[in-house]
């Protein structure tokens, strides 16, 4: 395995290996591991990012890699160079791994056809997929609940435009989770792997073991999709009162960025969610992905995991 473009590219053995390596890093049993010493990793983010970019950079540097993040605003793309030509030039410099985020669906898969002798990671492409975030959520749920099979997982928010929802549905349904979607009719879509679609928040969370909230993707939403953010929050914001209808041990998740007061209240986000645990898990998962793509289950013998 030398690319991570979408969830379907992962075998069960890949996922299990990534989980096991993640747990080693998460529990700090490999904090001095410099397995990527001498490797060059290039981050190409054509779309804004806080958590994904920062956690990849931290993972890369923690593992000893030479980490380079191209500033798109000062790159030759602003002089008319195409994205493909940019990739071809970066590839000619012989990096070991390129991590790409783009606002265009399927662009990363297209780019991978032009790249040789280099690993590629999709860090999110349009509304297509965000496989590393799905792996973070999978590892977080498995860490807290031990098993995915037969869990009731409700995903609430802007499903229509969400690459996180698509990747999570594809991954979690493979392991026997019962996936429900909660959204206004204009932001819902029927995806393979989904058991139920609800348009009422309370109905959708009553039996949930996990509630995964998503922001409104205002950069992709047209004005006619929802009347207003205020109307959306009135019907779909998860607050303490609405949360009381869910199971007492329900896990509240959010991939970020959160828009508090819209899809989640301040109290629920800050006191009842595992959002920051997901962020912490994100560094460990991305370390594990870098490790696995470049070395598989093998370890640098001087820095055993």
Swiss-Prot record:
**What's an example Gene Ontology biological process for this entry?**
'de novo' UMP biosynthetic process
Entries under InterPro entries matching the protein: Asp/Orn_carbamoyltranf_P-bd (IPR006132), Asp/Orn_carbamoylTrfase (IPR006130), Asp/Orn_carbamoylTrfase_sf (IPR036901), Asp_carbamoyltransf (IPR002082), Asp_carbamoyltransf_Asp/Orn-bd (IPR006131)
Q: Reply yes or no: does the keyword Transferase apply.
A: yes
Any Gene Ontology CC annotation: cytosol
Source domain of life = Bacteria
Q: Which UniProt keywords apply?
A: Pyrimidine biosynthesis, Transferase
Its recorded reaction(s) are: carbamoyl phosphate + L-aspartate = N-carbamoyl-L-aspartate + phosphate + H(+)
| Residues binding carbamoyl phosphate | 51-52, 101, 130, 133, 256-257
According to the UniProt entry, what is the EC number of this protein?
A: 2.1.3.2
Q: Give the multimer and partner information.
A: Heterododecamer (2C3:3R2) of six catalytic PyrB chains organized as two trimers (C3), and six regulatory PyrI chains organized as three dimers (R2).
Q: What does this protein do?
A: Catalyzes the condensation of carbamoyl phosphate and aspartate to form carbamoyl aspartate and inorganic phosphate, the committed step in the de novo pyrimidine nucleotide biosynthesis pathway.
Question: Its family?
Answer: Belongs to the aspartate/ornithine carbamoyltransferase superfamily. ATCase family.
Spell out the protein name for this chain. Answer: Aspartate carbamoyltransferase catalytic subunit
């Amino acid at each position: 395995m030398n690319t991570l473009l979408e969830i379907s590219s992962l075998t069960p053995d890949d996922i299990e290996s990534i989980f096991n390596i993640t747990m080693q890093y998460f529990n700090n049993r490999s904090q001095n591991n410099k397995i990527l010493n001498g490797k060059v990793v290039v981050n190409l983010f054509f779309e804004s990012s806080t958590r994904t970019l920062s956690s990849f950079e931290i993972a890369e540097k923690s593992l000893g890699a030479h980490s380079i993040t191209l500033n798109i605003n000062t790159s030759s793309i602003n002089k008319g160079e195409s994205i493909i030509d940019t990739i071809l030039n970066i590839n000619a410099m012989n990096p070991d791994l390129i991590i790409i985020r783009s606002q265009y669906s399927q662009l990363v898969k297209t780019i991978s056809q032009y790249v040789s002798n280099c690993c590629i990671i999709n860090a999110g492409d349009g509304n297509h997929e965000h496989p590393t975030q799905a792996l973070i959520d999978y590892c977080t749920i498995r860490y807290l609940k031990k098993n995915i099979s037969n869990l009731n997982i409700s995903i609430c928010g802007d499903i229509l435009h969400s690459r996180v929802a698509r990747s999570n549905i594809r991954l979690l349904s493979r392991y026997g989770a019962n996936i429900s979607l909660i959204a206004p009719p204009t932001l819902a879509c029927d995806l393979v792997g989904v058991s139920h679609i609800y348009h009422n928040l309370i109905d959708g969370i009553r039996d949930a073991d996990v509630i995964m909230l998503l922001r409104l993707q205002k950069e992709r939403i047209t004005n006619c999709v929802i009347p207003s953010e205020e109307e959306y929050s009135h019907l779909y914001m998860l607050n303490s009162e609405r949360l009381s209808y869910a199971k007492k041990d329900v896990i509240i998740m959010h991939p970020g960025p959160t828009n508090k007061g819209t899809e989640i209240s301040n109290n629920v986000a800050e006191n009842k969610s595992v959002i920051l645990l997901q962020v912490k898990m994100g560094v460990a998962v991305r370390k594990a992905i870098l490790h696995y793509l470049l070395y598989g289950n093998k370890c640098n013998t001087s820095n055993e995991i």
